[in-house]
UniProtKB/Swiss-Prot annotation:
Record Gene3D superfamilies: YggU-like (3.30.1200.10)
SUPFAM superfamilies found in the cross-reference section: YggU-like
Gene Ontology cellular component list: cytoplasm
Species name: Pseudomonas fluorescens (strain ATCC BAA-477 / NRRL B-23932 / Pf-5)
Database matches in PANTHER family: UPF0235 PROTEIN C15ORF40
Protein name, as recorded: UPF0235 protein PFL_5841
SMART domains referenced in this protein's UniProt entry, alphabetically: DUF167
């Protein structure tokens, strides 16, 4: 099992979120999930909104192309990225052949 899968041109990421971190960054793997540290607190959807903006910037797409599939109130999240323009340097992440 991998932390990502392709659904056509869309990328689905399984993430483990660490809110209230000292910086916004990808932090390797946490089990079968991509660990992401964010400075935003987990209050009133702030961490979710910050996650969408962080991923949009990292993958070179507008925020409107990032959607939360599951995990709205949980650290374990599944996110859909519609047609990412670029792929950050993440463990094993590659476009399908």
């Amino acid at each position: 099992m991998s932390y990502y899968r392709w659904d056509g041109d869309d990328l689905i990421l399984d993430c483990h979120l660490q809110p209230k971190a000292s910086s916004d960054e990808f932090a390797g793997l946490h089990g079968e999930r991509l660990k992401i540290r964010l400075t935003a607190p987990p209050v009133e959807g702030k961490a979710n909104a910050h996650l969408m903006a962080f991923l949009a910037k990292a993958f070179g797409i507008p925020k409107s192309n990032v959607s939360l599939v599951s995990g709205e109130l949980n650290r374990q999240k599944r996110v859909r990225l519609q047609a990412p323009k670029k792929l950050p340097d993440l463990p094993g992440l590659a476009r399908p052949a």
